[in-house]
Amino acid sequence: MPLAFSDISCCDSYESPVERIVAELNIGESQNIKLSNGDIVHLTLLEITDIRDSLRNAVRAANIKISVDGEEISLNSGNYNLPVTVGKVQIDCPVFKNYYINAPYDVAWELLKDARFRVWPKGSSYIKPGSFVYPIKQAWFAGKSQSGNEPAYVNTAEYPLSNKLYYHSFHDIGGTEGMDEIVSATEGLVISANNEILDGYDSISTHVGWIDIKSPDAVYIIDNRGWLAGYLHLNSIDPAIKPGVKVRMGQKIGNIGMQGSAGGWVHLHFLLCTKDFSSGRWVAEDAYAYLWESYIRQFKPHLMAVARPHQLVWTGQEVILDGRKSVSLAGDIISCKWTFTDGTTAEGAIQKKIYSKPGEYSEILKVTDSIGNVDYDFSVIQVYDREHPENPVPSMHAAYYPTINIR
């Protein structure tokens, strides 16, 4: 049976459960999963293989073989991958057990078996239309980001002499200090804001992993699904946002900042958790698919270029740049062009590159579709000197404002 991940709300009432059903499996285990539309799908977890780097032994990708109603497919995990359609379902794998090997910050996952899967009916929304908006007034991928268990890397957070990994289970969106406006992704009840907690909710901090919801730079809201959304590192919080207040979807929360444990770079740390009904603890919910879908609904882009996640390599080591996660919503992608920091260019979604000098590189991907739409993204490559791994590489988070409605 699928795990009992609750949609129970701490508010007076709650909406119908979202489309996705969560299930955990061990290798070799099979389950019949009842979808939100009543259909039954048979899942069997066959094999898990991770792909790790040679510097920190960090998980960078995965090959998770699963049978869906007898059809075998391979899934990646997190790292800017959207759910995959197979048979009558859409399915993804937000986390698997191999992350625990060298990750001290593991409590947010609350993983009980070898891998966790989310399953939606084929063609359904990832999250109920009209119940979730993009939480920042900013263009998609305008700056650096950390998402889907990507190892934290901004401001030299990746260091080859340290194998203590912080896999970023929530979603960071980089921006410009005090400028980008943060809005509530959902309707809901403010349970914590500006270092104050609503009476009766003090115990939540002990059930949200290592996160303390009492913070001067953060706002926490429980929505009508019973999900917990957190907005952290804020430069300022709107005076109307106070514990006990019910907020509207899209209502201003505050402005982006680098306060608290931001690590020295300006970003929104967007936290999304659901409650595990069996343990009472809050579990990290990978928000990438919901952010992707809500951004498309609001801003209606024709093309979405994706060059992420970042990579960490030694000098002289080959890097594979991959733009195949890019999606055209209006036509077919006909061109992927890379522009490299050494001034060279290359055509094709997949490119190989070797760096002889240590440093941080930002390689630009330009994607064009058959309608003539163009979109850009960039891939950050951090390169360390193999002979002197103790030397940190310089890092910079470049940001600009505004990022939308530019003429």
Where are these regions (language model features)?
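Short histidine-centered loop motifs in beta-beta connectors
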Residues: 175-184, 217, 222-250
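Surface-exposed, glycine-biased beta-strand/turn segments
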Residues: 116-217, 249, 258, 262, ...
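Surface-exposed, beta-sheet-biased, low-hydrophobicity segments with strongly acidic/polar composition
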Residues: 5-140
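Extracytoplasmic
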Residues: 28, 40, 59-61, 112, ...
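Extracellular/lumenal mature domains of secreted and surface-exposed proteins
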Residues: 287-407
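A residue-level detector for short acidic-glycine micro-motifs
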Residues: 47-49, 175, 192, 233-236, ...
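Residues located in well-ordered beta-strands
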Residues: 44-46, 189, 230
